[in-house]
Amino acid sequence: MGLFDFLKAKKTTAETAKNRLQIIIAQERSHRGGPDYLPLLQRELLEVIKKYVNIDVDAVKVDLVKDGQHDVLDISVALPEGPDKP
């Protein structure tokens, strides 16, 4: 204990709890594997594509691929061969 220790701002328990919660949330997100928005993104892409092309529900695939330091969003759309209109 130094002479000037009383001048330092002490961390509150709320700050400590907030920091711990942020660490826990970051760990949970990294263990889950993918972001929460991928299924929603896949549904919305399917809806937009269906406005212009008649495709199946399974025709749109959305995956998150980790490539070293980068995350790559891989979107694959299987289009029909004929000129179908919805």
UniProtKB/Swiss-Prot annotation:
Keyword Magnesium part of the UniProt annotation: no
Organism of origin: Stenotrophomonas maltophilia (strain K279a)
Keywords recorded for this protein, A-Z: Cell cycle, Cell division
GO biological process, one term: cell division
Descriptive protein name: Cell division topological specificity factor
Family listed: Belongs to the MinE family.
The keyword Transferase is annotated on this UniProt entry: no
Free-text function comment from the UniProt entry: Prevents the cell division inhibition by proteins MinC and MinD at internal division sites while permitting inhibition at polar sites. This ensures cell division at the proper site by restricting the formation of a division septum at the midpoint of the long axis of the cell.
